[in-house]
């Protein structure tokens, strides 16, 4: 990883590491079953998608593990940013925390009494708050994460990513309300792994929507929210290109350009 960081720096590229939490963690959970609720033995995923096996916010082992990971990342990556993930945490979201004994004990300790599953988002808030504090106080890093509409409170100074197709306006309004910065990468304009034309699907796909060159270029970075939003909240614009359906470097370039220009 150090070689990659050094190589990128030669071309004035800053590499920002992302460690997903609490979802998209099956590889780590497979090796360390103590990371998930019930300490389940979880097989490695061989296909893309969303897993219901999440990091357990009620287990101190989770925080020990993440602390070790972030310590190593902070040493390897000079970037002032570290991405915490936060998206696609199960179907329904965070559901495996509902009946977990460790999670129940944490809810009791935090005084959480609701039982409509909103309590699980408060556990996610607790998990993120602890990790955000670690990144800021120990390593001087600015936390980033994917915005989900049920994640109501965003710590000031964090950078959220607006990505979900059709929910960009809500994400931007949440950033303004929480005095947070936001990276604009809406699925309807900026997902470069989506095909540019009907019938031009990658060999492996899940029925992706089409994002034409015209759609990409029609992106309004301020999303109609005006100059104050651009000045105070807009962090930037990102094109996302996930490799789960990409089987060659040539396909990466084909998908990225000219839409990324």
Task: Explain the meaning of each model-derived region.
Residues 143-261:
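Flexible, acidic glycine-rich loops studded with aromatic residues
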């Amino acid at each position: 990883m150090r070689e990659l960081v050094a190589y990128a720096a030669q071309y004035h590229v800053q590499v920002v590491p992302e460690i997903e939490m609490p979802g998209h963690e099956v590889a780590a959970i497979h090796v360390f079953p103590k990371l998930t609720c019930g300490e389940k033995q979880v097989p490695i995923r061989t296909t893309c998608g969303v897993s219901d096996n999440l990091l357990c916010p009620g287990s101190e082992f989770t925080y020990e593990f993440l602390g070790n990971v972030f310590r190593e990342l902070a040493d390897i990556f000079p970037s002032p940013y570290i991405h915490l993930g936060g998206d696609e945490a199960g179907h329904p979201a965070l559901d495996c925390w509902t009946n977990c004994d460790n999670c129940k004990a944490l809810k009791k300790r935090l005084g959480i009494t609701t039982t409509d599953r909103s309590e699980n988002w408060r556990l996610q808030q607790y998990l993120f708050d602890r990790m955000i504090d670690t990144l800021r106080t120990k390593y001087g890093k600015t936390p980033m994460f994917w915005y989900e509409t049920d994640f109501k409170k965003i710590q000031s100074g964090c950078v959220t990513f607006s990505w979900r197709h059709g929910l960009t306006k809500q994400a931007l309004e949440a950033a303004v309300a929480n005095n947070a910065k936001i990276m604009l990468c809406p699925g309807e304009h900026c997902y470069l792994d989506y095909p540019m034309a009907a019938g031009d699907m990658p060999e492996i796909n899940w029925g992706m929507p089409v994002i034409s060159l015209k759609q990409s270029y029609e992106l309004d970075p301020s999303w109609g929210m005006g100059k104050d939003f651009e000045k105070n909240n807009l962090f930037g614009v990102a094109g996302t290109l996930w490799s789960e359906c990409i089987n060659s470097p040539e396909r990466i370039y084909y998908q990225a350009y000219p839409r990324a220009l």
